[in-house]
Design a protein with these regions (language model features):
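Canonical P-loop GTPase G-domain recognition
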Residues: 137, 147-152
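Charged helix-capping and loop-helix junction motifs
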Residues: 130-135
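Short glycine-rich or small-residue beta-strand-to-loop segments that form or flank ligand, phosphate
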Residues: 89-90, 146-148
């Protein structure tokens, strides 16, 4: 139940170069998204853009990197919960991993998905839809908001 969520998870999905990092880097700096407690940012993919670590420190954001899908486990998340004691979690999810797998994962006690956001590069959307439709549909099935960028 949503009422039982102590630590909301904001799950940001999208294929490589879809604008996830830019979107999150901007959002984490905004007053409307500010909180007093700690934000745990879990990066599951390294794109072209990078986070400004000094700015992240100013927003009390700590970063954990998970490079391999098999390393994203309930045990690893539970360890992060103990180490960081976050007030919220933001996940930049790897676009080649099934979102449904994460949605079905056992999460640490009190954690729950609050919002799913999918970033889409409008210049490559048709190519991904034509060649990776099942992966894209899995990505957007439960998304709350789709952000299209690079629109012409």
């Amino acid at each position: 139940m949503m009422d039982d969520i102590r630590v909301p998870i904001y799950l940001v999905t999208g294929f490589l170069e879809s604008g996830k990092t830019t979107f999150l880097d901007f959002t984490l700096q905004q007053e409307y998204f500010a909180i007093d407690g700690k934000t745990l940012l879990i990066l599951c993919e390294e794109g072209e853009e990078e986070y400004d670590m000094d700015k992240l420190k100013l927003t009390n954001t700590v970063v954990e990197v998970i490079e391999d899908e098999e390393d994203l486990t309930p045990q690893r998340l539970a360890a992060m919960d103990i180490i960081h004691q976050p007030e919220r979690v933001v996940i930049e999810y790897n676009g080649m991993w099934l979102v449904s797998k994460f949605e079905q994962m056992e999460l640490p006690e009190g954690w729950g998905i609050e919002q799913e956001i999918t970033c889409v590069d409008a210049t490559t959307y048709q190519v991904y839809m034509a060649n990776m439709k099942s992966l894209f549909m899995d990505m957007i099935r439960n998304t709350d908001m789709v952000v299209f960028n690079r629109c012409k």
